[in-house]
Amino acid sequence: MKVNDRVTVKTDGGPRRPGVVLAVEEFSEGTMYLVSLEDYPLGIWFFNESGHQDGIFVEKAEQD
């Protein structure tokens, strides 16, 4: 995923939330995504762990 991609994020106890990627930072353990959400328009960071499906919080949104 890259900047300006439309994504959904997994949050505690609720449905996936739509957002837009503002920044991407790569690390050896995974990737950090700064995602703009309705409640957080300036963005909030989410981490996707490499190699752990349970550690994936940001996914690319399906195209309509």
Curated annotation (Swiss-Prot):
Pfam families: DSRB (PF10781). InterPro entries: Dextransucrase_DSRB. Belongs to the DsrB family. NCBIfam families: PRK10708.1. This is Protein DsrB. It comes from Salmonella typhimurium (strain LT2 / SGSC1412 / ATCC 700720). The lineage of its organism: Bacteria, Pseudomonadati, Pseudomonadota, Gammaproteobacteria, Enterobacterales.
